[in-house]
Amino acid sequence: MTSAPVQTDILALAREQVLERGDALNESQVLEVLQLPDDRLEELLALAHDVRMKWCGPEVEVEGIISLKTGGCPEDCHFCSQSGLFQSPVRAAWLDIPSLVEAAKQTAKSGASEFCIVAAVRGPDERLLAQVAAGIEAIRNEVDIQIACSLGMLTQEQVDQLAAMGVHRYNHNLETSKSHFPNVVTTHTWDERWNTLRMVREAGMEVCCGGILGMGESLEQRAEFAANLAELEPDEVPLNFLNPRPGTPFGDLEVLPASEALKSVAAFRLALPRTILRFAGGREITLGDLGAKQGILGGINAVIVGNYLTTLGRPAEQDLDLLVDLQMPIKALNDTL
């Protein structure tokens, strides 16, 4: 009678595969991590931190974001209060160039190396691109900081224009796994987003692509999303946690439990051992102050400081003080050039 094969513990396997060899966990392995009981969370976070330190180093990249054009978006992303299709309190508004420059100055003062200009649109029109170009030129004249953009889906011509403006990194989130995406957005497809990201990479800009956890996806779909991102190989992955917005289709969803959110952070680190993994929106309501520390000691190596697009973040000083306490240096601007 043959005995059943001995099952290798997923964290022991991850230690040998990811920490020692630098080989990412695959989709089924990520699912095993996500299914771990809460009593193994501390062990999981410690492993994810070790992986981050070995393959990324101790530095933390700091970024600020600003909304150039807020609200009035024609798309129906179910999590977003900036959609013009929902009964949310956000109304369309434009930011003027002097305010944009001042925001960039304040971001740079925090020690940030990256400043991202965001617009709530399906994709940019000529007016928006002209405003972005003027904003980038004005910022460059007064502030020493890398500039990123997040302007929705792009044509090849628009990609080339942004590259010519000197945009360092372009953010366009896939938001969730390919199989779950139709439950989140119906006015465009996951493949349309993927195509924009492909063109951005081919134009020589860095690719920033992540999403939001806690939008009703199953653990299987969360593991699928990690695998989708691993296939894309982005330079940066921002991890958001759903902060349900009043008036949106997802306004009544439950906030992700903190233990599940932290488990997800660690799992994504094990799926993306060399990628910039950024704490983004929703971490305050999902994790609180203690969770910020646990996340940075559990695989995270980048943060957005200050407020987000339509929700409040932690004061920049709190995050920066935390990095000092943890003896984690802020990534300097000259390290990103």
UniProtKB/Swiss-Prot annotation:
Annotated residues that bind [2Fe-2S] cluster are located at C116, C149, C208, R278
**Residues reported in the UniProt entry to bind [4Fe-4S] cluster:** C73, C77, C80
Q: What is its EC number?
A: 2.8.1.6
Alphabetized UniProt keyword annotations: 2Fe-2S, 4Fe-4S, Biotin biosynthesis, Iron, Iron-sulfur, Metal-binding, S-adenosyl-L-methionine, Transferase
Radical SAM core domain spans which residues? 58-283
Query: Is Translocase included in the keywords of this UniProt record?
Result: no
Alphabetically, which GO biological process terms does the record hold? Answer: biotin biosynthetic process
Pathway where this protein functions: Cofactor biosynthesis; biotin biosynthesis; biotin from 7,8-diaminononanoate: step 2/2
Q: Which SUPFAM superfamilies match?
A: Radical SAM enzymes (SSF102114)
One GO term in the molecular function aspect is: biotin synthase activity
UniProt catalytic activity = (4R,5S)-dethiobiotin + (sulfur carrier)-SH + 2 reduced [2Fe-2S]-[ferredoxin] + 2 S-adenosyl-L-methionine = (sulfur carrier)-H + biotin + 2 5'-deoxyadenosine + 2 L-methionine + 2 oxidized [2Fe-2S]-[ferredoxin]
- Which metal ions or organic cofactors does this protein require, according to UniProt? [4Fe-4S] cluster; [2Fe-2S] cluster
Q: How is the cofactor bound?
A: Binds 1 [4Fe-4S] cluster. The cluster is coordinated with 3 cysteines and an exchangeable S-adenosyl-L-methionine.
Q: What does this protein do?
A: Catalyzes the conversion of dethiobiotin (DTB) to biotin by the insertion of a sulfur atom into dethiobiotin via a radical-based mechanism.
Query: Which family is this protein grouped under?
Result: Belongs to the radical SAM superfamily. Biotin synthase family.
Q: How does it assemble?
A: Homodimer.
Q: Under what name is this protein listed?
A: Biotin synthase
